[in-house]
Amino acid sequence: SSIEPNKHAYINVIISTIITTKRADDFIIAMCNLIQRLTIDSLHIVGDIYDRGPGAHIIMDTLCNYHNFDIQWGNHDILWMGAASGNDSCIANVIRMSMRYGNLGTLEDGYGINLLPLATFAMDTYADDPCTIFMPKMNFADAHYNEKTLRLITQMHKAITIIQFKLEAEIIDRRPEFGMENRKLLEKIDFDRGVFVYEGKEYVLRDTNFPTVDPANPYRLTEEERELVEKIHYSFMNSEKLKKHMRLSLIHISE
C-alpha cells in the first residue's frame, strides 16, 4: 500500500527465509495449531474418555498441552480416578473392562501397569478351562491378537472378574448405607446345581468352574488372589503418568 510500500517485500522475505531454512513444514504446523487455538476458545469434553476404546492415555497426553478445556466426568472416568486413588475394587473393575474389550495398551503401554502377575495367575488357575463366555469383544480392541494371546486375555478376564466380585462384597459389607446388597452375586449361586438364584427365580449358569470360590465363604480371597491384588495395587500406585492424568481430570472438572 501507499502507506506501507515495503510491506509486500517484507512478507516475501519472511516466506523466503522460512523456505530456505527448511522450516516450511514447521511453519505450516504452527499456523494450523494457531488456527485451532483461536477457533476453539474452550473445549468441553463430554466424559468417558476411558470407555472401551484404546488410546485414552494419548488423549490425556494431548489435553496436558491444551490451552483451555473442561471435562464432564463419565462413570468410566470416575472409575479410573478410584483406581488411581488405590481402591482395589475400582482397580479390578478397570482391568476387567480392559480385558473385556481387548484394550491392554492403555494399561501396559500408557501407564506401565504390570499385568504379568495376573497373566501367570490366570494361566495356572484356568489352565484347563476354555473360559468361553469371557472372550473379549474385539470390535473395541487396540490390536489384532493371535489365538494364543486371545486365550490368555480370556483367562485373565475370568480371573479378575471373580476377584472383582469378592472385592466389591467387602465394600458392600463395610458400607451398608450404600444399599447395594443385591450386588453381592457369588452368594446367590447354588454351586451344586449350577444355578444363579435371584428374587426367587433360577438362572442356569453358562460357566460353573470357579476353583477360587469357596461355597461356604464365597467372598474370601485365596492367598494367591490376595497376593495378586497387592501386586496390582502397587503397580497402580506407582504409575506417575496415571497420577498426572487423574490430577488433570480433577483440576479441569466442568462446573
Language model region names:
Residues 1-255:
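Feature recognizes metal-dependent phosphohydrolase scaffolds
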